[in-house]
Amino acid sequence: MDTLSSAKNIWDFLKINQDITKSDLILVLGNSDIRTVDKAVELYKKNYANKIIITGGLGRISSDLFDEPEAVVFKNIAVQKGVKDLDIEIESNSTNTFDNFRFTKKMIDDSKVNVKSIIIVTKPYMEKRAYLMAKEIFHNTNLAVTSPDIEFSNYPNQILNKDFVINMLVGEVQRLIIYASQSEIEQIKIPKDILQNYNYLMQKGYIKQLL
């Protein structure tokens, strides 16, 4: 067992790799990685949906990178890349994932628009948790989650370096365990080898993104 193979195993576990189909809405979860909104723009241009909601205020990580809420930063990028301004709405007050979904659900309900299907766009390693959380908020809605098409080995960059990403992977597994124990998401079986990788990485000091 080593650090990179352990991280790669967790990365693969956290991704869902769902097939996506045309939907009523693309919901973008704001975060520190602008590649997320690039994926949303790609889906919009391929006509998977003609409306986008971007959700996200200034989170604990993005506040060190952005001067404006995540949703504002992402919207500006989307418009620059060709998305019509009128096709984008933003929610810029949420600072955690549950509130991303709760506040967006209220926006949709208040608009009286009948949204039956949503494509959620997030970071690759957040696919599983995002899907489980969304299911708790968007009842009777067809949900699918997707993310930028990037493998673990190519994901780190100058802003989000390898150590940061590995810390985030460990934090994701911990959140799945804690939120399920608190009945905030449904219980899922975490394979034994993933738990071994998780514990190994914590022993190696990758604990900066733990709750």
What residues fall within each predicted segment?
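A structural signal for short, hydrophobic/glycine-enriched beta-strand patches
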Residues: 1-169, 210
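A conserved mid-domain beta-alpha-beta active-site/ligand-binding segment of alpha/beta enzyme cores
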Residues: 160-211
